[in-house]
């Protein structure tokens, strides 16, 4: 049986997979970026939990990361559309069907990355804060 953390991250990846951009989890940046953009989900860090003792529960504010990447002449507009679609997907159900207590995204800080012999990339790391509770740090 998957852990609470893995179940939530898999649901988040599934949510991103429904978007027009290609969504990968734990992969390296491919050589080609699709026209609609690319989302790379990184598991991130669960951080130190707050602990309650009766019953024993671990309350996490897990910081997963999504690398949003676009390429091409209209990368500014494509990047904006990609970020807006991420926000819409997250706002549609902030508990991922009850798997977590709440999730929210932090604002991206985009950067333009020049690529020799190709169109530049526009990319940003978007932190997604996942609030959830588990009965065990490994469960």
Regions found by a protein language model. Name each.
Residues 1-33, 44-139:
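Charged, amphipathic alpha-helical segments and their flanking helix caps
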Residues 41:
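Paired acidic/hydrophobic, glycine-rich loop segments that form the ligand-binding mouth/hinge
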């Amino acid at each position: 049986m998957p852990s609470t953390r893995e179940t939530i991250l898999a649901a988040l990846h599934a949510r991103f997979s429904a978007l027009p951009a290609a969504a990968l989890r734990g992969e390296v940046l491919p050589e080609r970026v699709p026209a609609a953009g690319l989302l790379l989900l990184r598991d991130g860090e669960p951080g130190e939990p707050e602990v309650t003792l009766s019953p024993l529960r671990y309350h996490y504010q897990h910081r997963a990361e999504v690398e949003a990447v676009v390429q091409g002449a209209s990368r500014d507009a494509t990047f904006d559309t990609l970020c807006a679609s991420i926000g819409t997907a997250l706002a549609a159900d902030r508990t991922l069907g009850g798997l977590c207590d709440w999730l929210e995204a932090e604002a991206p800080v985009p950067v333009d990355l020049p690529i020799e012999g190709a169109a530049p990339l526009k990319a940003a790391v978007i932190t997604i804060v996942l609030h959830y509770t588990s009965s065990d740090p490994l469960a």
